[in-house]
């Protein structure tokens, strides 16, 4: 027999079938936050569902913040204190960055619009009256000399042609006329009505413009002088240097030739036999000249011998002359060569 729920607390839970109304299965904290606290429990009965809906759990306002803090950890909270956020949400204290480019464009457009309005108002406005020039009061009662002269001359006839130059007609170079070429002006006679009357200034100006010497600017004169100097320098170069070998190249070529000859002389002749030396050229020519003189002398002696002499002495003398002539001829052949090698004394 059961008198109600047991008030004894121990490690062994009581049997829930005894008092099902008191031993309900509690919902989790996450389920209560998500709104699942009203789900059907296995131990609930149909009578309880039909009678009245169960009362919702009591949840504090900061429960969701505590749950999110537990899921993210404490590091995110510490970083949020330093204005650094690791989560997907944006900190409410941080403001959106200002777009300076759009702000500058907006200000530029405002300035342009303001200037356009000023230009439009200036164009539509009436012209401002000009300020009168200052005039000294001492000339108030003075009559104009031009007006007095016009009264003296009288009204000009309509049929009389006006002597003046039209636009772009007889335009000269604009240079002042030379004093030497300008014609002498005649003095006005007693019948002249006014100064300058009776002088044809148009003809005088045209004549002075034709006779005026043509003057060049300073830059053109300097340019002409420089071009003349360049032309003279080019002509001088063509006459003295163009097509000619420079002197330093000629000197260098002679030096190279002398060095080549010296190297050739210093090198041993490959045709020279061992133990011999080359006879100098002057000594060779001197020896050849002596041999030619000896040959001519022996030929003269051979010719002067008597033809009918058959003695042994005459025959021996003739044989000696022939032998010497043969030796001299052989020596002449040797010393007539360009190179003569002499055996060195050991």
Curated annotation (Swiss-Prot):
Modified residues annotated as Phosphoserine in this record:
91, 136
Annotated keywords: Cell projection, Cilium biogenesis/degradation, Cytoplasm, Cytoskeleton, Microtubule, Phosphoprotein
Q: Which GO terms describe its biological process?
A: establishment of mitotic spindle orientation; motile cilium assembly; non-motile cilium assembly
Q: What is its main location?
A: cytoplasm
- Report the GO terms under cellular component: 9+0 non-motile cilium; centriole; centrosome; ciliary basal body; ciliary base; cytoplasmic microtubule; plasma membrane; spindle pole
**Residue intervals of the Enkurin domain:** 251-343
Which residues lie in coiled coils?
none
In terms of PROSITE patterns, this protein maps to: ENKURIN (PS51665)
Q: State the function annotated in the UniProt record.
A: Microtubule-binding protein which regulates microtubule organization and stability. Promotes the stability of astral microtubules and facilitates the proper orientation of the mitotic spindle. This allows the oriented division of basal keratinocytes and contributes to epidermal stratification. Required for the assembly of both primary and motile cilia. Destabilizes the interaction between CCP110 and CEP97 by competing with CEP97 for binding to CCP110 which promotes the removal of CCP110 and CEP97 from the mother centriole and allows the initiation of ciliogenesis.
In its UniProt entry, what is this protein called?
Enkurin domain-containing protein 1
